């Protein structure tokens, strides 16, 4: 519970301040549009995974066991893997109650393509009855089809870091559709990101917010990594495991106290996924 609370208050809320400041500008430069998209990617991850962790913690307190809903999605090497790690409960629901009843992948290629597109149309519609969510869902449906039928062998030959970077880029584009309330604004933002709108490459506000939040964004990126798994691969893992018995409770306590302090001193506390 404390870990989820800290994710929400310390990381998601701070990312939210960055996105709100940038979206409040009269216009965005290329650099500003990328900074907003990256900050929002971390905001929605720590926001949703944060209160998912809080729900798991509350369940443990009352003797219930809930499955993990997020499994470090930003280390995914493909979009397919991303959706096995992101919002696992939603993906499981659509797989069990839509994809498999339609025949799943046990049918011919044409029907398999149809099934995937139906699932992702409904996934987009589940988030909201507006064009940006429909396009968001079909965008992922198209990406999954490309990976499944065209890029599977190629991705196996590429270094892991290249696959992770390209997957994060594709996910970042998807979050732009998610961020805006209408499709035209999302498309304009993407045009700015890729230098297709005539916007300036950078601007003083983008530089300011980047410099003042660089350490925080690096911290958010590091917090997205599975450190427990990574540390278990080190030769000194036994020593680290022994130290973890008292270091982890100490870190969690400090994070919780910092979160309480931030809640008391700040009024900014949105819950993004509550609107879905």
Question: Model segments located where?
Answer:
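Membrane-embedded transmembrane alpha-helical bundles that form the catalytic cores
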Residues: 1-275
């Amino acid at each position: 519970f404390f870990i989820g609370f800290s994710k929400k208050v310390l990381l998601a809320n701070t990312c939210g301040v960055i996105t709100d400041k940038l979206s409040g500008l009269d216009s965005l430069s290329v650099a500003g549009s990328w900074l907003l998209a990256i900050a929002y990617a971390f905001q929605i991850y720590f926001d949703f995974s944060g209160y998912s962790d809080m729900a798991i913690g509350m369940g443990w307190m009352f003797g219930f066991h809930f499955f993990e809903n997020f499994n470090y999605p930003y280390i995914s090497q493909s979009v397919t893997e991303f959706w096995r790690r992101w919002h696992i409960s939603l993906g499981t629901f659509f797989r069990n109650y839509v994809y498999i009843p339609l025949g799943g992948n046990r049918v011919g290629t044409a029907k398999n393509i149809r099934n995937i597109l139906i699932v992702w149309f409904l996934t987009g519609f589940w988030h909201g009855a507006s064009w940006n969510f429909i396009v968001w869902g079909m965008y992922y449906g198209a990406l999954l089809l490309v990976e499944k039928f065209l890029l599977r062998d190629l991705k196996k030959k590429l270094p892991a870091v290249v696959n992770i970077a390209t997957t994060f880029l594709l996910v970042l584009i998807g979050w732009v559709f998610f961020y805006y309330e209408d499709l035209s604004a999302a498309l304009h933002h993407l045009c700015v990101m890729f230098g297709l709108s005539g916007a300036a490459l950078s601007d003083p506000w983008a530089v300011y917010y980047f410099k003042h939040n660089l350490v925080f964004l690096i911290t958010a990126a590091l917090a997205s990594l599975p450190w427990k798994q990574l540390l278990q691969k080190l030769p000194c893992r036994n020593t680290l495991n022994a130290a973890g018995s008292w270091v982890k409770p100490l870190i969690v306590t400090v994070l919780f106290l910092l979160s309480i302090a931030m809640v008391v001193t700040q009024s900014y506390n949105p819950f993004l996924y509550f609107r879905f």
